Amino acid sequence: MLWQGESIRKVTGGRRRPAQGKRRFEIGLAPADTHIGEDRSKLVRTTGGNTKIRSMRAQFANVTNLANGETKKVKIENVEENGANPNYVRRNLLTKGAIIRTEIGRARIMSRPGQDGIINAVLLA
């Protein structure tokens, strides 16, 4: 759990006296950290009683070839680059914008696996 409310400290270092305590809607969840492996997802309740599918592990990605508009379900081999964090490459974490190696070549992830529960990618030329 991660509290995302306003800080008690001001920029100057002084202390604010909050009018209220911490509220449930100010609390966020830990990141999903989607790894490469046998498909596993988790259903999470969100604001308004809606649900989100969090992909914990993923083995396949829907890769689209923009040249001919064809989409294929292909196996993910490993993570090659990740602009979000260099450590994610070592840990093989799948995030939006990560470049992955697949059976048909390199692809960039366009979806958010921790939010959407699915991996959509675009084939790189």
Curated annotation (Swiss-Prot):
CDD domains: Ribosomal_S8e. Keywords: Ribonucleoprotein, Ribosomal protein. Signal peptide: none annotated. Gene3D superfamilies: 3.10.290.70. GO terms for cellular component: ribonucleoprotein complex; ribosome. Residues 1-20 are annotated as: Disordered. GO terms for biological process: translation. InterPro entries: Ribosomal_eS8 (IPR001047), Ribosomal_protein_eS8_arc (IPR020919), Ribosomal_Se8/biogenesis_NSA2 (IPR022309). GO terms for molecular function: structural constituent of ribosome. Belongs to the eukaryotic ribosomal protein eS8 family. Part of the 30S ribosomal subunit. This is Small ribosomal subunit protein eS8. It comes from Methanoregula boonei (strain DSM 21154 / JCM 14090 / 6A8). The lineage of its organism: Archaea, Methanobacteriati, Methanobacteriota, Stenosarchaea group, Methanomicrobia. The gene is rps8e.
